């Protein structure tokens, strides 16, 4: 869930368009792909009218998402401060001579948290944690 990380309204708008059935992909496939319950996704099918069930589901999910993101970023800062030298050596062995960029380091520690377009996660993190 939350593959696009725009904001709650932007996420809902994109998912609504995808579940409307006009994208050439079945609603069931899209629901599985984005982790949305099938019964909620089916309510969005063949319509451009905003679906209240999808909005409610995303609103509940964003509460959990904010908590998880905040925890991940806190861990990220502490992890790199406390384990910097040992971690740098391990990463040099994996990536070669250069240390990977911030987004790659965060992705390694946060099990792949990133946004759809590969934009720096910190921009999105600050947006959600305001």
What name fits each language-model region?
Residues 57-121, 129:
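Auxiliary, metal-adjacent structural segments of Zn-dependent hydrolase domains
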Residues 27, 125-129:
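Short, surface-exposed linear patches
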Residues 1-78:
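N-terminal low-structure segments adjacent to metalloprotease catalytic domains
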Residues 7, 122-125:
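Helix N-cap / beta->alpha transition motif
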């Amino acid at each position: 869930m939350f593959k696009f990380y725009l904001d709650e309204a932007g996420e809902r708008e994109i998912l609504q368009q995808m579940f409307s059935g006009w994208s050439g992909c079945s609603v069931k496939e899209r629901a599985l792909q984005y982790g949305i319950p099938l019964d909620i996704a089916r309510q969005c099918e063949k319509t451009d009218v905003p679906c209240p069930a999808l909005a409610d589901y995303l609103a509940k999910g964003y509460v959990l998402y904010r908590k998880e993101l905040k925890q991940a970023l806190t861990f990220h800062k502490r992890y790199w401060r406390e384990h910097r030298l040992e971690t740098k050596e391990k990463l040099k062995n994996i990536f070669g001579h250069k240390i990977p960029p911030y987004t790659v380091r965060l992705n390694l520690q946060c099990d792949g948290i990133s946004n759809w377009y590969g934009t720096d996660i910190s921009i999105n993190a600050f947006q959600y944690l305001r």
